[in-house]
Amino acid sequence: MPLEENPACRSRRSFLQLSAAAAAATVGFRIVTEPMLARADSRPFPKDAVVIDANENPLGPCGVACSAVTDMASQGGRYSMWMTDDLVKTFSDLQGLKPHYVLPFPGSSEPLHYSVLAFTSPAKSYVTADPGYEAGAHAAKISGARVVRVPLTKTYAHDVKAMLAAAPDAGVFYICSPNNPTGTLTSHSDIEYLLDHKPKGSILLVDEAYIHFADASSAVDLVKADKDVVVLRTFSKIYGMAGLRCGFGIARPELLEKVAEFSGWNAMPITAVAAATASLKDERLVPERKRINATIRQATCEWLSKNGYSFIPSQSNCFMVDAKRPAKEMIAAMAAQNVFIGRPWPVWPTYVRITVGTQPEMERFQEAFQRVMSGAATASLTPTPEASFLNLDGLVIPASRA
């Protein structure tokens, strides 16, 4: 069903958008990203550190992507916007989409934030899972929207019926599937149910950052059907391009135009575009990396189960484990072992998120985790000044790991 649109709605929306933009300028608007949430400082890690805290891919860009970056670096003095058109066409052809349904960005954080700014307001709430990825809530605060957090179901899926009941005034329903931080899925049928029963004028913002790791159906088919859906994709996860920055907002043109009102139409970094295009053309990349990630994740979870540790089964490149103590203490204790794990979520105060690293990295994680859990590293459980915690919009994140 098309979004309701009349001159009065346009006028009011324009006013709210201008208000949001003014508020953003006043408070120093920042796009919150996974590295910002995972880390509060930019100092180098200690030597030989195991870094499994920000859902990065330790494999990095694939070979053809690295070659593409090298080949393109000497042309960095040109905008070369035609390359972005080629990237969009390559992706659109693979997905069976029309090119004007795809808008490229440096990663998926920007379209996430801009979508929230475009479709929420003081009268239009932002609805998300708890625990869930926090960045959209930050954008909702900029727009003056009410942030509604709804607990996951017993199977750790988004509780779409509870989300509907919690916010009849919703502007955006944010669905991250697989979910960050749990790595669990929300079924396509549940997403369709939410779409069929949502308030008129609202959208579903479906974040598929981790979809390539999972056995799951994409919501791109709903975009093809011209539904009120914006799908987010990124090259930061399975493609290993977190530092290069490339992603897409995918929606029917009317919705993308509203998102673009906040972003403009800027040139993309050509090295990222070249690497992304080359990666899409490598047919073996996704299935091979999915297999590697699943094998290492399964082996790690089998070890946790064998040793009596509680965790949440995942279909992503991360999972959550119960530390049986305050999460921030566990994070500090693991950091003292030179193993850096993910941040806590207030709703589950004893759970920590673990990114799936390489097999040697996960073996070192197991050694450090067992030492801490057995009490062998008890002296590390009290956070030192270097492991103290900051608070960013109510989000607890580590201040230092040196």
What do the PLM-derived regions correspond to, one by one?
Residues D228-S305, Y309-I312:
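PLP-dependent aminotransferase class I/II
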Residues G76, D86-S125, S143:
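Phosphate-binding glycine-rich loop
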Residues P2-A23:
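N-terminal secretory signal peptides and thylakoid transit peptides that target proteins
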Residues V160-P168, P181-L204, E208-I238, E254:
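Active-site pre-lysine segment of PLP-dependent enzymes
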